[in-house]
């Protein structure tokens, strides 16, 4: 309530600032699913300001994926080499930053489109021109703190969340492989090399496997960094509880309550990955792509959409769908446009696809029916598709 009272004078400006910040963060870091740790906190503020869940979701997951679509520094594990790569390097472009201007164009236009879309929805709701079937169950998001904590301070929460965000950004951006910046690697080597009379301080007290900032995606494992993110969140949670003198029992109860809320999300994640396993092992998408014989923007885009829907995880999407599509390309002049196309398709499917992990989390956690979300978001998705097609066409013509 204290935080809400401070941002309430901003009104809709807070929504617009949230959209811009999430989009910029995703664009500059390439993070998408990793940012869900901040969604409940920000969305709760939006709900307490009096806006509905659709505004909260589109201002968070919508802006994150808009940022990904216009992501300037997006990288992922290449299943062929097990190293980090950009979309440009993946398709074969020698300059990994060749699409900086087109992506910035996508980013700015996408943010403007989302702000317009959300603002129009808010206006229509206020004027009672639209109505969506949404359960009024904000108690699922904001629970009364157990115990006598009336004098609890908000500044530790803000400071610690800011610290988590900074570490997350520094840890996830591949400084060495993407920018050839070795400062964090050398700092890590210096810290791990510290010793007292032959006793290695850092490796023996903390860990021998904790990687340097910017190298959290190590060993070609696309999920390895989630271990460090989980440990970081656990540490932050315990620190906040300690500073605010929250009782151990209350901390455990709140943690258990949070796990209980996430159980449906975990179940749906399991279902989504079951679809992935069946699709990936069957290999029918690769067969369809191979039978296409040649690259075609229309057909290849449809196959990319299908691959993103069925394979769920970006690592397997790249392995089973994007790689075969790129192998069909014989004209090197279209590499840059294809990189933008594939990145954009993955981002769009993540906003609207029923198997999108970030969407599954959001809709389940906030109890929003998928049909309601689809009814609300389809116009924005159509606008994004047209915007992506326009930018890709411009790159092809240039």
Whereabouts are the PLM-identified features?
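Membrane-interfacial loop-to-helix junctions in multi-pass transporters
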Residues: 6-17, 49-55, 153-155, 226-227, ...
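Hydrophobic alpha-helical transmembrane segments in multi-pass membrane proteins
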Residues: 14, 111, 160, 164, ...
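Interfacial loop-to-transmembrane junctions
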Residues: 259-262, 363-383
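Hydrophobic alpha-helical transmembrane segments of multi-pass integral membrane proteins
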Residues: 11-41, 266-282, 292-332, 347
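Alpha-helical transmembrane segments and, especially, the helix-loop junctions at the ends
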Residues: 22-39, 53-98, 307-320, 339-366, ...
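Transmembrane helix-loop junctions in multi-pass membrane proteins
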Residues: 25-34, 78, 170-181, 242-252, ...
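Long, contiguous bundles of hydrophobic transmembrane helices that form the permeation core
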Residues: 85-86, 94-222, 226-250, 365-372, ...
């Amino acid at each position: 309530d204290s935080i809400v009272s401070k941002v309430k004078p901003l009104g809709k400006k807070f929504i617009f600032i949230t959209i811009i910040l999430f989009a910029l963060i995703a664009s500059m870091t390439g993070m998408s699913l990793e940012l869900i740790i901040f969604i409940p906190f920000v969305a709760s503020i939006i709900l307490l300001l009096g806006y509905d869940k659709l505004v909260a979701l589109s201002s968070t997951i919508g802006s994150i994926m808009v940022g990904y679509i216009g992501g300037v520094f997006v990288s992922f594990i290449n299943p062929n080499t097990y190293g980090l790569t950009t979309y440009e390097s993946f398709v074969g472009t020698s300059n990994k930053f060749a699409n900086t201007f087109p992506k910035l164009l996508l980013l700015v236009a996408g943010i403007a489109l989302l702000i317009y879309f959300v603002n129009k929805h808010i206006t229509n709701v206020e004027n009672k021109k639209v109505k969506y079937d949404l359960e009024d169950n904000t108690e699922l998001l904001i629970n009364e703190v157990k115990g006598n904590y009336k004098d609890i301070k908000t500044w530790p929460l803000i400071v610690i969340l800011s610290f988590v965000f900074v570490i997350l950004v520094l840890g996830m951006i591949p400084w060495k492989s993407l920018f050839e910046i070795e400062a964090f690697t050398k700092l890590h080597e210096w810290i791990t090399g510290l010793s007292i009379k032959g006793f290695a301080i850092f490796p023996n007290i903390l860990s021998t496997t904790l990687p340097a900032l910017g190298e959290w995606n190590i060993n070609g494992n696309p999920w390895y960094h989630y271990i460090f993110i989980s440990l970081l969140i656990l540490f932050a949670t315990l620190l906040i509880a300690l500073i605010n003198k929250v009782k151990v029992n209350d901390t455990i109860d709140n943690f258990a309550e949070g796990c209980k809320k996430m159980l449906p999300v975990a179940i749906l994640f399991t279902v989504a990955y079951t679809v992935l396993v069946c699709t990936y092992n069957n290999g029918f998408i690769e067969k369809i792509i191979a039978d296409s014989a040649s690259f075609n923007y229309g057909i290849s885009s449809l196959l990319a959409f299908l691959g993103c829907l069925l394979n769920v995880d970006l690592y397997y999407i790249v392995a089973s769908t994007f790689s075969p599509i790129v192998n069909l390309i014989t004209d090197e002049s279209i590499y840059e446009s294809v990189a933008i196309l594939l990145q954009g398709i993955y981002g769009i499917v993540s906003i609207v696809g029923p198997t999108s992990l970030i969407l599954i989390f959001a809709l389940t956690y906030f109890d929003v029916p998928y049909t309601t979300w689809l009814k609300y978001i389809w116009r924005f998705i159509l606008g994004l598709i047209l915007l992506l097609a326009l930018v890709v066409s411009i790159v092809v013509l240039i």
